[in-house]
Structure formats: C-alpha cells, structure tokens
Amino acid sequence: MLRLLLALNFFPSIQVAENKILVKQSPMLVVNDNEVNLSCKYTYNLFSKEFRASLYKGADSAVEVCAVNGNHSHPLQSTNKEFNCTVKVGNETVTFYLQDLYVNQTDIYFCKLEVLYPPPYIDNEKSNGTIIHVKEKHLCPSPRSPESSKPFWALVVVNGVLVFYSLLVTVALSNCWMKNKRNRMLQSDYMNMTPRRPGPTRRHYQPYAPARDFAAYRS
C-alpha cells in the first residue's frame, strides 16, 4: 500500500488554471512518536479573507480529518472524531498538528483551501499530497529512578532477614532433635546393661539306685 501511495504522490501535476491557488506539501512524513505537523503553504495571502482550510485523508479525499472556517483573526475549528487535530493559521500557511496517530492511519493526505469572501470563490488545485507513514511505536523500559528502587531494596532486605531467621530456627530444631535422639539411645543402652537377678536354678538329681546289702556278701 505504501508503494502505491508513493507512486500516486509523484505523478506529474496538472497545469494550474489562472483562478486556482497553488499549494505546496512535503512528499512524505514519517511518524515515530504518534504525532506529526503537516504544513500547507499556499500562493495566496489569507489575511483579511474569509476562507475554509481543511485536510483530507485518502487518494480520493473521502475522509475529512479536520477543518478551520472563518478569517485570520477568528478561526473556528472542526475535527473528525477519529483524529486528534489542531490547526494554526498563518498569512500563507495552514499547519495541521496531528496527535495520537495509529498505524492503520497511514495514508496520503491532501490540503485544501477555499476562499469564500471577497468574491470570486477560489480554491486550490489538488496537490500531490503528503504520505504520512505511521510507524508502530515500541516502548522501551525506562530506567528506574532511585525513589522507585527504594521499595524494591526494602523488600529484598526483609526477605533476607526472614530467610536468615528461618535458617536459624531450622538449625536450632535440628540440634534439639539430635540431642534428644542421642539421650534416648544412651538411656536404652543403660537399660540393657542393668544387672538382672538370677532366676531359680534347677536341681539335678541322680537317678535312684537301691542300696546294696554288704552283710549278705560277708556271710
């Protein structure tokens, strides 16, 4: 689309009639910060004249961006709701200040001037126009100011203190647990080493044998 607009912009202009006003516009304006100033320079002095100066968008000038009516001292402005536009009028120059432009508003723009009083009615011959190329804005992270970094460092310090306190509590609980475990083991060993009272012993009886009668052997 941009190439087509460039081709339209550089077509040779048609020969201007005697009752037409010439207008000079920049061939192309590149917008990087969503705002641009478009100056329309005319070969006609607007001082003490009743006029209407307007800016149109599109190759067929289908959309009126903004316009100013009246005279040099008391201009009345009207603006399309889709644009943020203000107008400044000079003796031979009308400047349109466009702000908050979007990428989809890239197009060719035409200046138009109509002299309403005194007669006769005169307007400008259509110029080659100005291509306004709106680039997409990429926001870069701004460096942090010292004031904005204070809450961040305060949060870091608080978190550090909490982590250190948690570590101390964990170490203390671990030491207590180890000491309790060691004490239980020592008590268990002491109980195992306590002398026990011997139980009743079994008596071993010799098997009974009848007593021998030695007197019988003697006789």
Swiss-Prot record:
Transmembrane segments: 152-178
An annotated GO BP: positive regulation of interleukin-4 production
Assigned keywords, A-Z: Cell membrane, Disulfide bond, Glycoprotein, Immunoglobulin domain, Membrane, Phosphoprotein, Receptor, Signal, Transmembrane, Transmembrane helix
Keyword RNA-binding among UniProt keywords: no
Name of this chain's protein: T-cell-specific surface glycoprotein CD28
Positions glycosylated per UniProt: 37, 71, 84, 91, 104, 128
PANTHER family noted in UniProt: CYTOTOXIC T-LYMPHOCYTE PROTEIN, T-CELL-SPECIFIC SURFACE GLYCOPROTEIN CD28
Membrane topology according to the record: Single-pass type I membrane protein
Positions where Phosphoserine occurs in the chain: 188
Physiological role: Receptor that plays a role in T-cell activation, proliferation, survival and the maintenance of immune homeostasis. Functions not only as an amplifier of TCR signals but delivers unique signals that control intracellular biochemical events that alter the gene expression program of T-cells. Stimulation upon engagement of its cognate ligands CD80 or CD86 increases proliferation and expression of various cytokines in particular IL2 production in both CD4(+) and CD8(+) T-cell subsets.
Quaternary structure and interacting proteins, as annotated: Homodimer; disulfide-linked. Interacts with DUSP14. Binds to CD80/B7-1 and CD86/B7-2/B70. Interacts with GRB2. Interacts with PIK3R1. Interacts with PRKCQ.
PTM per Swiss-Prot/TrEMBL: Phosphorylated by LCK. Dephosphorylated by PTPN11.
Pfam hit, one: V-set_2
SMART domains: IGv (SM00406)
Compartments where found: Cell membrane
Extracellular-facing ranges: 19-151
InterPro entries assigned: CD28, CTLA4/CD28, Ig-like_dom_sf, Ig-like_fold, Ig_V-set
